[in-house]
Design a protein with these regions (language model features):
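Electropositive polyanion-binding surfaces
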Residues: 1-355
Length: 355
């Protein structure tokens, strides 16, 4: 990612995404297996990748100081963070640095952050303002982490850094740009989410009451979740409970017209998955469609042929991934903490002890 400021105060964002189609051909064994898997699966000590590691971690990955093929987005925002233009084309890129969120946040909080990081904060905050303006909501959910510890594991939570939300806004912006291009071209696949139902909202208000979180009757849930601090335990619990309002997400493919009921209610915008083709199958297809439409070229036939089946393939992959991740968390939650294995839990009752 690279961000510059134009002469009239506009922001120009260059956002590079791995070009998986430069390495994977339609119908080859890697492509067929990727369709079977759908997404990358994550475990504490390993991952089951969507693509072979020689691609996902090396040849196709945008590693620092390496020249790689990419889909390069150029998105222009006006000085108040509104998108005014977007296009994508194939390019060769060289990544200059790879920073963790903590490293990026430390640099932003320092005296002289590199220009892109300084502008990332400004653009991210403007995009958060635009999200509030259109009635969208992004959950800053504490991350549940499993870390190796000696011979065992520890389970904990980590509140996200502010830079994570700003970076997420750039990804969301790119997904919205992709959705706009596909809707204009009347062909593509969108990420969808239905509005929250009234019963779920009523239950969530009961949770807020139990946690002693003030939620005025006139306040909508997007305004509530924005005021919550994930570093506070009661707010973290409320944010976790609020995920019930974000259920029902899916995909909607279309061609030859504009689909109905294809909005993403949580974002209050049209939206597409496009930024993670190395770990999510659908993003490769969204990218190919946007590259073709940006160049006023026909969408490749192999993309058209796969569109109808992608929503169900991705739904099955997401269900499998959720079962897998939940099983791992359940296993860790019922196990003893690291360093406590084999230690008896003794309760005395009169002359008897139980362990």
């Amino acid at each position: 990612m690279h961000i510059t400021r134009g002469p009239n105060g506009e922001f120009v964002i260059s956002y590079a995404i791995a070009d998986v189609a430069a390495f994977v051909s339609p119908g080859d064994p890697i492509d067929l297996e990727a369709h079977r898997r759908g997404v990358t699966l994550y475990a504490p000590d390993c991952r089951t990748p969507l693509h072979p590691p020689v691609l996902s971690e090396r040849a196709a990955s945008l590693l620092p100081n390496e020249v790689r093929p990419a889909l390069l987005w150029t998105i222009t925002l006006n000085p108040r963070g509104q998108m005014v233009a977007a296009e994508v084309a194939r390019a060769l890129v060289r990544s200059r640095a790879q920073l963790s969120y903590r490293q990026a946040q430390a640099e932003i909080d320092g005296i002289t952050p590199r220009p892109t990081l300084g502008l990332l904060k400004l653009v991210g905050q403007w995009r958060e303002f635009r999200e509030r303006e259109r009635g969208g909501a992004s959950l800053k959910i504490p991350q549940q982490e499993i870390q190796p510890h000696g011979d065992g594991w520890t389970l904990g939570f980590r509140a996200p850094e502010p830079v994570e939300a700003w970076n997420a806004q750039i990804s969301l912006l790119t997904g919205m740009a992709a959705a706009h291009i596909m809707l204009y071209g009347q062909v593509g696949i969108l990420r969808t989410m239905p509005p929250a139902d009234l019963d779920s909202l009523r239950r969530l208000r009961q949770v807020a009451k139990a946690l002693r979180i003030v939620w005025p009757p006139e306040m909508d849930y997007p305004d509530l979740v924005r005021m919550l601090n994930p570093a506070w335990p009661d707010h973290a619990a409320m944010l976790s409970a609020a995920t019930v309002l974000f259920r029902g997400a899916g995909y909607r493919s279309f061609s030859g017209g504009i689909p109905e009921d294809a909005d993403h209610a949580a974002l209050a915008s049209d939206y597409a998955h496009i930024t993670a083709p190395l770990r999510r199958l659908v993003d490769r297809y969204s990218g190919e469609i946007c590259v073709a439409l940006s160049a006023d070229q026909p969408v490749p036939a192999w993309v058209f042929h796969a569109l109808d089946g992608l929503p169900e393939q991705m739904a099955a992959a997401e269900r499998r991934a959720k079962r897998y991740e939940r099983a791992i968390i359940d296993l860790l939650e019922v196990g003893p903490p690291a360093g406590q294995q084999g230690r008896p839990d003794v309760h005395r009752h009169g002359d008897r002890s139980q362990s």
